[in-house]
C-alpha cells in the first residue's frame, strides 16, 4: 500500500507522487505516517521531512506550514520547502555560517528571534542533505 503525498508552496508543486511512508516534523514533535493513518491536521515545524520510496529515503527541508492527513492522502501546505537533491551543499554550509554569525551579533530581542529562525532554517537545509538513511524493504 502507498500514500499519495502532495507538498505545495504558494508558487509551485514541490512533490506529488506515491510514497511508502513519511516522517514529518510538527510543532508537537515528529510523527510517522503509514497507509490508513488516522485523519489529522497538524502544524508543520521548520525541520526535515523524511520520505520513504521503494527501498530508499529522500528528504525535504520544510520551512513551516500545515499538513492534512486523511487515510492514504497527505496534503502539506508549506511556506517553502526544498528537496535534498535541490540543495547546493556549499551554499547551505555558507548560509549556516552566516546565520550563526548573525545570531552572535544580534542586538535586542527582535533581532535575536529573527536570527534564531534564520539559523534554524539554515540548519534544516544542512540536515536535509545529510539525512537520507538507506533502508531495505
Swiss-Prot record:
InterPro entries: ATP_synth_F1_dsu/esu, ATP_synth_F1_dsu/esu_N, ATP_synth_F1_esu_C, ATPsynth_dsu/esu_N. SUPFAM superfamilies: Epsilon subunit of F1F0-ATP synthase N-terminal domain (SSF51344). GO terms for molecular function: ATP binding; proton-transporting ATP synthase activity, rotational mechanism. The keyword rRNA-binding does not apply. Keywords: ATP synthesis, CF(1), Chloroplast, Hydrogen ion transport, Ion transport, Membrane, Plastid, Thylakoid, Transport. It is a peripheral membrane protein. It is found in: Plastid, Chloroplast thylakoid membrane. Gene3D superfamilies: 6.10.140.480, F0F1 ATP synthase delta/epsilon subunit, N-terminal. GO terms for cellular component: chloroplast thylakoid membrane; proton-transporting ATP synthase complex. Its main location: plastid. The keyword Chloroplast applies. Belongs to the ATPase epsilon chain family. F-type ATPases have 2 components, CF(1) - the catalytic core - and CF(0) - the membrane proton channel. CF(1) has five subunits: alpha(3), beta(3), gamma(1), delta(1), epsilon(1). CF(0) has three main subunits: a, b and c. Produces ATP from ADP in the presence of a proton gradient across the membrane. This is ATP synthase epsilon chain, chloroplastic.
Amino acid at each position: 500500500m502507498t500514500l499519495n503525498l502532495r507538498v505545495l508552496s504558494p508558487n509551485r508543486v514541490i512533490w506529488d507522487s506515491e510514497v511508502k511512508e513519511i516522517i514529518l516534523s510538527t510543532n508537537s514533535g515528529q510523527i510517522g505516517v503509514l497507509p490508513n493513518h488516522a485523519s489529522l491536521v497538524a502544524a508543520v515545524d521548520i525541520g526535515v521531512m523524511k520520505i520513504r520510496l521503494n527501498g530508499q529515503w529522500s528528504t525535504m527541508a520544510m520551512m513551516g506550514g500545515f499538513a492534512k492527513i486523511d487515510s492514504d492522502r497527505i496534503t502539506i501546505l508549506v511556506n517553502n520547502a526544498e528537496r535534498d537533491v535541490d540543495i547546493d551543499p556549499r551554499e547551505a554550509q555558507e548560509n549556516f555560517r552566516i546565520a550563526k554569525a548573525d545570531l552572535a551579533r544580534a542586538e535586542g530581542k527582535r533581532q535575536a528571534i529573527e536570527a534564531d529562525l534564520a539559523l534554524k532554517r539554515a540548519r534544516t537545509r544542512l540536515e536535509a542533505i545529510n539525512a537520507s538513511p538507506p533502508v531495505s524493504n
